[in-house]
Amino acid sequence: MSSWRKAKKSEQKHRLKRIARTRVQAFARDVRISAHKARRVIDQIRGRSYVETLTLLELMPYRASYPIFKLLYSAAASASHNLGFKEADSYISKAEVNEGAVLKRLKPRARGRSYLIKKPTCHITIVLKDRTLNEMSTPTSLS
């Protein structure tokens, strides 16, 4: 491998480390709720502050709000413990729901038949960022 290529790889590693220090990701895999129902909640909290989102999730009547609440709480705990983020300055920069595996079960019916029951799962991803770090990293124009 040429020295130019090694230098480029090293530069990419350092760039990824810088990005990793400014955000915290939390994943919930195989949550037993349909992706469509979880997206209904996720779409309402994307881009909001951490404190505002906790209030919203506590008041929402949807079943999907509890696993999302737990995941958000976990992400904030990781951010404050590992990177020293203040919870008041954190906001949700990215929140997405993807479909997971479908659990298939059989429901017995009359005359020896059976119907298929599909139990959908989903994967939830939440990324928290700190507003103060983003303000410091953006360059200001000199005019």
From Swiss-Prot:
<dbReference type="InterPro" id="IPR036394">
    <property type="entry name" value="Ribosomal_uL22_sf"/>
</dbReference>
<dbReference type="GO" id="GO:0009507">
    <property type="term" value="C:chloroplast"/>
</dbReference>
<dbReference type="InterPro" id="IPR018260">
    <property type="entry name" value="Ribosomal_uL22_CS"/>
</dbReference>
<comment type="subunit">
    <text>Part of the 50S ribosomal subunit.</text>
</comment>
<keyword id="KW-0934">Plastid</keyword>
<keyword id="KW-0687">Ribonucleoprotein</keyword>
<dbReference type="GO" id="GO:0019843">
    <property type="term" value="F:rRNA binding"/>
</dbReference>
<keyword id="KW-0694">RNA-binding</keyword>
<comment type="similarity">
    <text>Belongs to the universal ribosomal protein uL22 family.</text>
</comment>
<dbReference type="GO" id="GO:0006412">
    <property type="term" value="P:translation"/>
</dbReference>
<dbReference type="Pfam" id="PF00237">
    <property type="entry name" value="Ribosomal_L22"/>
</dbReference>
<keyword id="KW-0150">Chloroplast</keyword>
<comment type="function">
    <text>This protein binds specifically to 23S rRNA.</text>
</comment>
<dbReference type="GO" id="GO:0003735">
    <property type="term" value="F:structural constituent of ribosome"/>
</dbReference>
<keyword id="KW-0689">Ribosomal protein</keyword>
<keyword id="KW-0699">rRNA-binding</keyword>
<comment type="function">
    <text>The globular domain of the protein is located near the polypeptide exit tunnel on the outside of the subunit, while an extended beta-hairpin is found that lines the wall of the exit tunnel in the center of the 70S ribosome.</text>
</comment>
<dbReference type="GO" id="GO:0015934">
    <property type="term" value="C:large ribosomal subunit"/>
</dbReference>
<dbReference type="InterPro" id="IPR005727">
    <property type="entry name" value="Ribosomal_uL22_bac/chlpt-type"/>
</dbReference>
<dbReference type="InterPro" id="IPR001063">
    <property type="entry name" value="Ribosomal_uL22"/>
</dbReference>
<protein>
    <recommendedName>
        <fullName>Large ribosomal subunit protein uL22c</fullName>
    </recommendedName>
</protein>
<dbReference type="InterPro" id="IPR047867">
    <property type="entry name" value="Ribosomal_uL22_bac/org-type"/>
</dbReference>
